[in-house]
Amino acid sequence: MNYIGEHLLPGQLGQLFILLFLIGSAVACLSYFFAAQVKLESDKSLWNLLGRISFFTQAVSVLAIFAILFYIIQNHLFEYHYAWKHSSRSLEFKYLLACFWEGQEGSFLLWALCQSILGLLLIRNAGKWEAPVLSIVSFAQFSLATMVTGLYIFGWKMGSNPFMLLRDSGVLDNAPALHLNFDPLQPLRPDYLTSIKDGNDLNPLLQNYWMVIHPPVLFMGFASTIVPFAYAIAALWTKQLGEWIKPALPWSLFSTAVLGVGIMMGGMWAYESLSFGGYWAWDPVENASLVPWMTGVAGLHTLLIYKATGHSLRATFLFFILTFLFILYSTFLTRSGILGETSVHAFTDLGMNWQLLSFLLIFAIPSLWWFLKSYSQIPTIKKEEEASSREFWMFIGSLVIFLSAIVIIGQTSLPVFNKLFNTKLAPPADVEFSYNSVQIYVAIILAFLTAISHYLKYRTTDRKIFWKNMFWPIGISLLASLLYIFMGEVAYDRKGPVFQASIWAAIVLSLYTIIANASYIFIGVKGKLKNAGGSIAHVGFGMVLLGILISSSNKEIISNNVNGIPAPLGKGENPRENLTLVKDLPIDMGSYTLTYEGDSAHPKKQLWYYKIRFKKKDGQEDFVLSPNAFVNYKGNQGLMANPSARHYWDHDVFTYITSIPDPSNQKDTSRFKSYVQKTGDTIFYANGYLIVDSTKIRKEVPKELFGENGKLFEVPLNVFSKTGSNYKVTSRSAYVKGQWIALPDTLTSEGLIVLLEQANETGKVQLGIKQSDAILKYVTLKAYKYPFIKLLWYGVWITAIGLLLSMYNRIKKNSAKQLSI
């Protein structure tokens, strides 16, 4: 049957390029494998050439798949399931790219694209390591290709195809109106596409600029871990157990920098888009990304140890192998659906669990077996490191990082243990503290070791020189610490004095880390920044620690409920920590006066932007924050909020919406009820009463407007609410050319409208009173003050700059040595 309006050519081209991706990566893997095995140089050259052509073919295919899928999404071709599920016509152009990585298929393609780019760079620069390293990278590409084929092999579906048509996805099976004779068992109508007006849209939480740039950086970090892994396996394969260190070092630095930045970009997205009031929640998916970075950092430091002293080569092999395996394990965790109930980041289950598990095991089993088999052959120095040597303490630091990673991944894997062993292990009652109570001591140890490591020499250190060089850093650090102790605070006593004291210790040592490493730039490398990459990275790391410790321990909720107005709140929200603002009614909040000035709606979506004015009570500052909220968005019940923040050099004011009126109650169906009263009389309404204060008549009115005998009557009223609040309102009515024209007064906080219908000079008045829920416009918000959070963000970038600077220097040195040879 021909279906009207379908565009099949893009999908057919996409299917062709997926097939080329699959075949090209397989041929590249085999070609490079044979190139690594053969002895004759002529044969090796031919296999290498075939490998390069095949790898280039699969790389072009991945790029073409990416371009075609973007074309489908951009042109709203909703006959394709991926476009219908992840995009909509109302989606802003800048968020179209984010549609790729909302779905599993698109994120696999992003991973493959990043890995292709790295593979092309390796072809150019790997030299004699090209064949074994590219064989492993190509096999990883082949594994990713199987994830997006959607082919059936002996009844088993391999992967999920991004070019699947909507009519083949099963989504329309239960839509009788789209089938012939309204029978779901009959084929779809030829014109079914005319009923598909729009797509399902992108998750509102992903409609943020960080989600356009964060996933590509993160997946480049994921992809980059294959390179040190491939070098390590290639070394075991070719028995060149020590020679791989030099070419692997720049890649290790690159991977550590990019993956670290990618992870913290996710923290920035969480800070600006999620409403839990922070940047890190020890979410299982966050942890699954953090652990490979930690083992990669451990591997980087043991690699440096081996390069300088010959120690720790076995540990370097293990750490780099585990880094990539943890990436694959995190892929299994986030995509298998096993974390669906414990993480806000996890993908939904596409029925690929066995394939994802195979992806992990097919790398894990051979690589770990190869490592164990070759363990005794890996060179090692029998003489123990000196306790005063740099390598001794660097290894201790690497070991601490590794053990910390094992603790994190162990707790993160509780759902996996429960699934495997049919147990019911429950996470701790306070999940965040269960992590923090361990990691605070890791932070203390690492801060101390990071501060002193550069002042130690490899193999042995002269104590006199060490203490001489450390004199000024220690002195300045003590002064800075005393300054913070007397002027700063750690307002975190709810977990007891021991934990609070640990935070103090970590802050002091973080200051020491920053000052000691900044000093080393001048003491150790004489101010030559190009040689100070390690110290710069350590300064950034100290800033990250300090930013986390100060901002988290002193985070202050400033939206204390001072007006007592109740509002329906989401699960877990404390009414005492949420402040309700009635439109145009100023409310005190700490050192600010807040006013809800209005809102505006998105022209195409159920998205509201709220204008909240913050005024400093001392009159020195006046600004507006505009948090937004989604209500019943695309059928999802409840409130979804995006925060807004005001940034200062020393703190952030961070706020998000926690409650708004139900839009279905905003239609006004109530009517005025009339009362004939005189001065001093009382009128009762549902939430209180009114007293007529007086009747005033203004006769001096413009005759051209009011006529010859026109008058303006004003009736001030005192309003007494059940909540104890008192208000004054004034209702006015004009007598113009024989007709009454009322000018009502609205008391928004009470949902009350007072209308002066008639009045006379004796003081007798006829008042219309109306109460309506539609009148009461309010928002409830929660606000935090985050001190010195910029230390965290700047620290991330400084760490990355230091690592990339070190990478540049290593590449430059390697190139110079090759030229000299």
Which ranges hold each PLM region?
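Solvent-exposed, non-transmembrane regions of integral membrane proteins
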Residues: 1-821
